[in-house]
């Protein structure tokens, strides 16, 4: 009886041993899956709540700006082609570093006395890159000179611009976030071969949209 009483334990021990082996094998082959961080989380952590809201309301800025400006300026708006058409961004929005011919157009207004459509004199701006591949844009001339960094976004057809303004004879713009009154946020897109635009929704100038067109200078400076 004693000898027989031990026999029923053999299959049980074998079963337990088999389960432990399977668990050990599962533990050894298990891998930890880490979800990649959303690109919008990176620039969103830097942008102020006000600028995140401006970017999120970009579609509304386009709609209201064009609705107000088209009755009197339809011909001028149409002549600008893709520059003044929403949702015109193409793939590969990253600009090539170098010097650019730039011009600005403001559309719509948030203040009664502001013009609903205005073109400004052309100027030069520059796209810079550092060793890490970070792209920045600097407006080189004028009394209001925005400068800032381009951030990757979840939307592969656009980059996010976060920058600030240099005023008057200031040599350097303030860092983004240093003076909220100068902070500037927008969307950077490629809209045609060798043509980009920077769209600033709800700027502090009294417009509803500010659009900067960028085309590379033909003769790039050496170096």
Predicted feature locations:
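C-terminal motif of bacterial Sec signal peptides marking the signal peptidase cleavage site
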Residues: 15-18
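An anionic, turn-rich surface loop/hairpin at beta-sheet edges
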Residues: 110-123, 162-186
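Short beta-strand segments that buttress and anchor functional surface loops
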Residues: 135-141, 161-164, 198-203
């Amino acid at each position: 009886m004693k000898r027989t009483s031990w026999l029923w334990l053999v299959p049980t021990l074998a079963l337990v041993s088999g389960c432990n082996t399977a668990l050990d094998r599962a533990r050894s082959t298990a891998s930890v899956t880490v979800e990649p961080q959303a690109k919008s989380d990176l620039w969103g952590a830097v942008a102020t709540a006000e600028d995140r809201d401006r970017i999120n309301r970009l579609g509304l800025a386009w709609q209201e700006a064009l609705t107000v400006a088209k009755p009197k300026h339809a011909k001028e708006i149409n002549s600008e082609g893709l520059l003044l058409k929403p949702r015109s961004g193409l793939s590969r929005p990253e600009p090539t570093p170098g010097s650019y011919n730039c011009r600005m157009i403001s559309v719509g207004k948030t203040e009664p006395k502001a013009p609903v459509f205005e073109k400004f004199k052309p100027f030069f701006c520059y796209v810079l890159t550092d060793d890490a591949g970070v792209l920045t844009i600097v407006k080189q001339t004028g009394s209001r000179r925005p400068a800032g960094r381009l951030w990757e976004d979840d939307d592969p057809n656009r980059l996010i611009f976060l920058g600030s303004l240099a005023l008057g004879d200031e040599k350097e713009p303030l860092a983004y976030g240093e003076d909220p009154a100068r902070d500037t946020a927008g969307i950077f897109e490629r809209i045609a071969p060798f043509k980009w635009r920077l769209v600033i929704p709800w700027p502090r100038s009294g417009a509803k949209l500010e659009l900067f067109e960028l085309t590379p200078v033909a003769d790039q400076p050496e170096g």
